[in-house]
Amino acid sequence: KRVLFSMVLLMAVSFSFAQTKNVKEAKSIANDVKPNFKQAEQLIGEAMKNPETKDLADTWDVAGFIQRRINEEQMKNAFLKKPYDTLKVYNSILKMYEYYNKCDELAEIPNEKGKVKNKYRKANASSMLAERPNLINGGIQYFNLDKNKEALKFFATYVESASYPMLADKELAKNDTLLPQIAYYATLAADRVGDKDAIIKYAPSALSDKDGGKFAMQLMADAYKAKGDTAAWIKSLEEGILKFPGNDYFFANLV
């Protein structure tokens, strides 16, 4: 039994080492002069699911790095006037946001001594901020293609990223003048796919948008009504009357 236990333990250690090796190899492949991104994504994809590595910040840091490299290679092709995939550029940025944010969450967990050593935040936040406008571009492209579920992901990520702890020092919720407009776009995309919860989630951030605010409030009121939340519906109509007195919709529905 002791020999069998030792063999099982040895296999577990070997498997764990293999997954850690996958993470390092995936990063190395993505960093090649001629990277094989398919192979890199396959390796890191396995590590992102494996119990031994899925809760390690480094795994998600490498996952985000691979997406950043995909974006860089596509942009290099564009600069050299070679064929490039615009949607691949945008989707790599969307995934980069997801992976770097997950990396940051894991890196903020205190170690066994109760200390937080987040070595990833500064560099990853810088990469995310540099590409944040492309979340808008990606959302607009999908919205114009009538692929509203995909558009919603981009607009929603843009809005939600304003509240990411790793970007807190930029105070995006206060300083980003485009935020209300993109929140309105998120509300429109959510309406197109019939996602009432998403409308209710993003519409409040859109109310200060000069052109779309009144429509966001209207869509939010409709969403509450559709969900059968009469109290919230009436409250949103009353708020609409106060915020947008020139819009007859709110008063007409309240009476």
Which residues does each predicted region cover?
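Start-of-domain marker
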Residues: 19-80, 84-88
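Structural register within alpha-helical repeat arrays
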Residues: 25, 39, 63, 70, ...
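Alpha-solenoid helical repeat scaffolds
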Residues: 57-62, 115, 137, 168-173, ...
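Short coil/linker segments at helix-helix boundaries
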Residues: 66-183, 197
